[in-house]
UniProtKB/Swiss-Prot annotation:
It comes from the Bacteria. It holds the Pfam family LamB_YcsF. It catalyses: 5-oxo-L-proline + ATP + 2 H2O = L-glutamate + ADP + phosphate + H(+). This is 5-oxoprolinase subunit A. One of its GO terms (biological process) is carbohydrate metabolic process. Keywords: ATP-binding, Hydrolase, Nucleotide-binding. The gene is pxpA. GO terms for molecular function: 5-oxoprolinase (ATP-hydrolyzing) activity; ATP binding. It comes from Shigella sonnei (strain Ss046). It is an enzyme of class 3 (hydrolase). Catalyzes the cleavage of 5-oxoproline to form L-glutamate coupled to the hydrolysis of ATP to ADP and inorganic phosphate.
C-alpha cells in the first residue's frame, strides 16, 4: 500500500526544513496568505534537495487572517488570482531546476471550493490552463475533485490526520468544537482507519466514507514534528509506503 504525505509550508513555521525530511509532497504558500518570493525560493530549494514533490498552495488574498476569511469573489477573479499564484511558483521551481507537480488550495479557498461548484470550476480551470499535467489536490469527495475530473486533470483526494470530520465527510469548521484533534493516539488511529479502510468516524459518531490518496500534516501544530515522525514510523510498521 502507498500513501502520499503532504504538508503546507512557507507559512512562517520554524519546522519547515525538518518537515521536508518527513513528507513526500510540499504545498508552498504563494504570497496571498503567507510567504513571499524569497521564502518560496527557499522552500523550493529545500524540497528539491530532499526529493519532495513541489506544489503551489494558492489562497484568497487574505494575509490579515491567514487565508481563513470567507470571501465571495467572482469566479473570473478567483481564476486570475489562482493562475497568478501557481504561475509564480512554477517559474520559481523551473528557475532552480525543479518542476511543480501539484496544486492544493489553502484555507477558506479550499473549504469553499469543496462545496461551491463555481469556485471549484474556476480553480480547476486555472490549474488546467497553467499545465494539464498538474495534479489537483482537494478534500476527498468534494466539488473540487469533481471539477478537476471534468477538466481531465489527475486528482488526489486528501484526508486530514488532525481534523475532526462531520457525518457527510466534510471537515468540522475551525470555529466549532471538535475541529482539531489534539490527542496524538486519536489522530494516528483516525489516519490509519482512513488510509487502510477508507472511512472516518465523525464527531457525532457516524462513519463517513473517504478516499485517502494523500494525508495532510499541519506544520503549525505544537507537536507537528513529533507527530510526523510517529506517523512515518507507524506507516513503516504497517508496510505503508510514503511516496508522492
Amino acid at each position: 500500500m502507498k500513501i502520499d504525505l503532504n504538508a503546507d509550508l512557507g507559512e512562517g513555521c520554524a519546522s519547515d526544513a525538518e518537515l521536508l525530511t518527513l513528507v513526500s509532497s510540499a504545498n508552498i504558500a504563494c504570497g496571498f496568505h503567507a510567504g513571499d518570493a524569497q521564502i518560496m525560493q527557499a522552500c523550493v530549494r529545500e524540497a528539491i534537495k530532499n526529493g519532495v514533490a513541489i506544489g503551489a498552495h494558492p489562497s484568497f488574498p487574505d494575509r490579515e487572517n491567514f487565508g481563513r476569511s470567507a470571501m465571495q469573489l467572482p469566479p473570473e477573479t478567483v481564476y486570475a488570482q489562482t493562475l497568478y499564484q501557481i504561475g509564480a511558483l512554477a517559474t520559481i521551481a523551473r528557475a532552480q531546476g525543479g518542476v511543480m507537480r501539484h496544486v492544493k488550495p489553502h484555507g477558506m479557498l479550499y473549504n469553499q471550493a469543496a462545496k461551491e461548484a463555481q469556485l471549484a470550476d474556476a480553480i480547476a480551470r486555472a490549474v488546467y490552463a497553467c499545465d494539464p499535467a498538474l495534479i489537483l489536490v482537494g478534500l476527498a469527495g468534494s466539488e473540487l475533485i469533481r471539477a478537476g475530473k471534468q477538466y481531465g486533470l489527475t486528482t488526489r483526494e486528501e484526508v486530514f490526520a488532525d481534523r475532526g470530520y462531520q457525518a457527510d465527510g466534510s471537515l468540522v469548521p475551525r470555529s466549532q468544537r471538535g475541529a482539531l484533534i489534539e490527542n496524538e493516539e486519536q489522530a494516528l488511529a483516525q489516519t490509519l482507519e482512513m488510509v487502510q479502510h477508507g472511512r472516518v468516524k465523525s464527531i457525532t459518531g457516524e462513519w463517513a466514507t473517504v478516499t485517502a490518496q494523500t494525508v495532510c500534516l499541519h506544520g503549525d501544530g505544537e507537536h507537528a514534528l513529533a507527530f510526523a515522525r510517529r506517523l512515518r514510523s507507524t506507516f513503516a510498521e504497517k508496510e505503508i509506503v510514503v511516496a508522492a
